[in-house]
Amino acid sequence: MFKKKKIGAIDTLIDKDFVLRGNTSFSGGLRLDGKLYGDLTMEDTGGTLIMGEHSKIKGKVTVETAIVAGEIVGDIKCHDYLELQPSSIIKGDIEYN
């Protein structure tokens, strides 16, 4: 049957009260509960993005793995695994390999 993807460890946590402005890159695992106004890219393969229910990204997202429960205003490109939770809102194109 279907198997759940094993998600790696979270290396970085952005709290719900935190707002980032500008393009950002990360490596490892990122848990976003706050807001990001700018593009988000991974620095190396294996980058995992987990977005909380009240999180928001306004910009282009390029990651290996993503679990989205928040809002993305912009395009998202996932290279390996993409999971959209019922609360997710995507206002842009979705590209998945």
Name these PLM-found stretches.
Residues M1-I7:
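Terminal amphipathic alpha-helical/low-complexity segments used for targeting or macromolecular assembly
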Residues E43-T45:
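Extracellular repeat-rich scaffold modules on cell surfaces
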